[in-house]
Structures are given as C-alpha cells and as structure tokens.
A protein has these predicted regions:
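Interfacial segments of multi-pass membrane proteins
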Residues: 40-53, 125-131
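Interhelical loop and helix-boundary elements at the membrane-water interface
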Residues: 2-41, 75-79, 96-127, 147-177
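Membrane-interface interhelical connector segments
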Residues: 54-79
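Short Lys/Arg-rich amphipathic alpha-helical segments
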Residues: 30-49, 85-89, 93
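Juxtamembrane boundary at the C-terminal end of a transmembrane helix
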Residues: 184-190
C-alpha cells in the first residue's frame, strides 16, 4: 500500500490546485526522500511562526518552568494560543489535503504518490503542536514523526488501507499523534 515511487504532480487545470497543495508548494518534488522534505518544510514554517509569536525564544524563556505551548495548572492541561493555532492549522491542512491527495492519487494512478507530502505536513505539525519552540526540541519532534511515519506501528498501517486521500492523510496524522505523545514525555524530563 505504501506506493511512493517518484513521479510528477498533476498539472491539468482542474488538478493544478491539488498538485500545488499536495506537494506542499513543491516540497514533495525534492529528492531524495520527498516525505522527509515535506516534514522539513513543515518544521521550518512552524519554527518561523514560533519566532514570530514567541519573540526572544532562543533558550532562556522556559528556565522558569513555564512552557510556551502548554502548562499544567489548577484547572488542568492548558495550551497556549500558538499550540491552538498549530492544531487549527492541522485541521485546515487535513481538510484541504484529503481532496487534494485524492485528486493527485487518481490523476497519477497510484494509491499513495510519493510527491504528495501534505500528509507529512499535517502529521509533523501535530507532533510540533506541544513542542518547545527551540531547535533541539523541534529536531527531536522531526525525528519522532519520521520514525513513526516510516515504521508505521499498529494501527497506523491499517489506516493506509482507507480509500483515497483518507488513507494518505490519516496514517500520517496517527504517526503525528504518536510523536506528540512521546515528545510530551520527553519534554517532561528534558
């Protein structure tokens, strides 16, 4: 089911939007490993946003124990506005990515075309939603997402069997969720 050979995006007028979205503005056309390039593009965009919304976020801001993207309080687990914005972006990218991935898959005749990386973007952002906005933690988030996306532990591989864009997107969202949970544990101790 993991049919990811190299190919080019759909280029017809009705599918141009799907090719642009599906490749995440061309990141999926980079070689080798278009999925990794899609994840790196997602990470770079997320870090750019983190620097804009958390000015001065190089290293000293979390020394007080206050985390910029989530915190435990008397009322429970609280997410910051940047974490919530990241989760909203995941929802929007998924809503747009499912039909785009479906269209590109139909056009290419492949179940999961390698150049479609919008799924990696959604999954990577899901892992990054609770990440500390610094490079060491962001790179760990990248590695965790790629690990779960490539190895596809249970039940991620089963999600690939869903039809069209659903299977393309949901297995990466599950990998992103696995990465988020492991990153949450790692950040508790690091």
């Amino acid at each position: 089911m993991n049919d990811r050979p190299s190919s080019t995006p759909a280029t017809g007028k009705k599918t141009l939007w799907a090719g642009v979205v599906g490749t995440f503005f061309g990141a999926g056309l980079l070689k080798p490993g278009p999925g990794t390039w899609g994840s790196v593009a997602a990470l770079l965009l997320w870090m750019s946003g983190a620097l804009l919304f958390h000015p001065g976020t190089s290293y000293g801001w979390w020394a007080s124990g206050v985390h910029p993207n989530y915190a435990w309080s008397d009322s429970g687990f609280v997410l910051t506005s940047y974490a919530l914005a990241t989760l909203c972006a995941v929802i929007i990218v998924t809503a747009i990515g499912i039909p785009a991935a479906t269209r590109v898959a139909e056009e290419s005749g492949r179940e999961d075309p390698g150049h479609v990386v919008i799924d990696e973007v959604a999954g990577q952002w899901l892992t990054l939603a609770i990440c500390r906005p610094d490079w060491p933690h962001a790179l760990v988030a990248l590695a965790l997402f790629r690990l779960f996306d490539i190895t596809k532990p249970w039940p991620i591989r089963k999600l690939e069997a869903l039809p069209g864009g659903w299977g393309i997107m949901l297995d990466d969202l599950a990998a992103g969720l696995y990465g988020l949970v492991v990153l949450l544990v790692i950040q508790h101790w690091w």
